[in-house]
Amino acid sequence: MTIANKPLTIAVLGAGAWGSALAIHLSRIGHQVKLWDHNPENAATLESARENVRYLKGVPFPDALSVQSDLKVTLADVDAVLMVVPSQAFREVLQKMHHIMMGSKSHYHLAWATKGFEPETSLMLHEIVQQELGEQISFAVLSGPTFAAEVARGLPTAMVSASRDQQEAQFWADAFHCDTFRMYTQSDVVGVEIGGAYKNIMAIATGLSDGLRLGANARAALIGRGMVEMMRFGDALGAKHETMMGLSGLGDLVLTCTDDLSRNRRFGLMLAQSQRPAEDVIEEIGQVVEGVKAVKAVKLIADKYQLDLPIMEQVYNIIVGQSTAEQAVKELMRRHGRSELEFG
């Protein structure tokens, strides 16, 4: 359950659905968890209700979970920090967190379960960490096919802890492990981050397809060809094919493309059915739709490396208002034939 049977004190930064779910899991299996929300009013509501009524209604907070809005108080005397803030806030929170931590202790364990790219720079999150904290910092990326509601309820779950430092990867795997939660380890940080971000784009694509009632054949084709695109993109950035075929790649892709708990898939469904601008649909969903930010970042990177990523291109065109879902389908089907196994 814990590192050498010793409970840890863990700060979870970000009290949305995913951060709350991970905090609930960690505290339920014996760790002391301090969940941070940057908004004092939200933090007070969470602490008084003892559950996240907005995102995880009916799942009570364990006694070992406390909610804070003061970052310095949250980080006091912790063994480890898990960041689960939106990608656009990642750098700012990282800077503040590290400044506080370095004032109190020389070493701490760092991981994040945020998926996506930094919107302003199109950088992957590990690149931000290396820019801000140095190339030698140890960290882990936690990713895989997961829905917050199911993790919070204690349903069986498997994820990946990726780090170039095997001990760091194992630290987080051990911290999460219990009878209902299995965390595998590996070293391909780039591949794990790409899988976690790219699958959100494909979830939007399958949502658009299903919103147009194009059928199960079309959905399966999008998932299969989306997998090829993800591998092609990963090749350009140094990811391993084996990673793309694992939990953080194929596993997460299938989950988010086929279940309506995925807000990216729901976004695609609503966009196709309503024919409204993307911004209006995002506002109605009321949560961050990471795939919208991811597709803009991937488009910039794809243009830089001259990558052929046709599904991504059409999702991008729809989101920025350059095409409709119906037009995008026609463009994809008009493409010249090619070998199915041509990844480059």
From Swiss-Prot:
UniProt protein name: Glycerol-3-phosphate dehydrogenase [NAD(P)+]
Keyword set includes NADP: yes
Class in the EC hierarchy, top level: oxidoreductase
Family: Belongs to the NAD-dependent glycerol-3-phosphate dehydrogenase family.
Lineage: Bacteria, Pseudomonadati, Pseudomonadota, Gammaproteobacteria, Thiotrichales
Keywords noted in UniProt: Cytoplasm, Lipid biosynthesis, Lipid metabolism, NAD, NADP, Nucleotide-binding, Oxidoreductase, Phospholipid biosynthesis, Phospholipid metabolism
Major place of residence: cytoplasm
SUPFAM superfamilies: 6-phosphogluconate dehydrogenase C-terminal domain-like, NAD(P)-binding Rossmann-fold domains
Species of provenance: Hydrogenovibrio crunogenus (strain DSM 25203 / XCL-2)
Record EC number: 1.1.1.94
UniProt-annotated binding residues for NADPH: 18, 38, 115, 148, 263, 288, 290
Record HAMAP family: NAD_Glyc3P_dehydrog
